[in-house]
């Protein structure tokens, strides 16, 4: 797709094994931000990433998938139609990896720096304590960018990372404004 140079982008990241609350929050938040003209950037993975991309598309917004593999591979496979819709709607699926590169585990933390670097701010919806989303948050902070985290249940494994970010000073996200 063709993107405007000065379009503002927000990263929305989180757990692949998200709760129903997190999935709904990611999609709703992405839809509201896309309706305000912001481009949603995420990694295209299952869970929060997928729902963020879908939320942006629901409101006819622009979204960018940053893949951790070559563009001739689709990961996860079930998102092939979603990635086509992203491109057809004026967004993009991008990767720093050459054709033929599989989605290896070491590629995901590396692609997170691109997600953080493309966005004016990063929102972590849900994340465990050992989550790649926390790597994205750290990279965003290293670049001097704001990091928002959605508060979650103290009993939820998928909220331990976001609650940890809040204790460290992340901006609490309680609405899309």
Model regions and ranges:
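Glycine-biased, small-residue-rich flexible motifs in mid-sequence functional cores and linkers
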Residues: 1-177
């Amino acid at each position: 797709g063709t993107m405007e140079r000065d379009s503002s982008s927000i990263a929305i990241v989180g757990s692949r094994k998200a709760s129903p609350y997190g999935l709904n929050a990611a999609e709703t938040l992405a839809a509201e931000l896309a309706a305000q003209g912001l481009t949603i950037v995420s990694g295209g993975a299952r869970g929060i990433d997928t729902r963020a991309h879908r939320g942006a598309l629901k409101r006819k917004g622009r979204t960018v998938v940053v893949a951790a593999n070559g563009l001739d591979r689709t990961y996860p496979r079930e998102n092939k139609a979603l990635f086509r819709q992203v491109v057809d709607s004026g967004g993009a699926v991008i990767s720093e990896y050459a054709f033929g590169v599989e989605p290896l585990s070491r590629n995901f933390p590396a692609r997170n720096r691109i997600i953080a670097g493309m966005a004016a701010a990063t929102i972590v919806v849900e994340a465990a304590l050992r989550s790649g989303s926390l790597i994205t948050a750290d990279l965003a902070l290293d670049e001097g960018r704001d990091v928002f985290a959605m508060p979650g249940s103290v009993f939820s494994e998928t909220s331990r990372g976001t609650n940890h970010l809040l204790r460290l000073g992340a901006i609490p996200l309680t609405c899309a404004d």
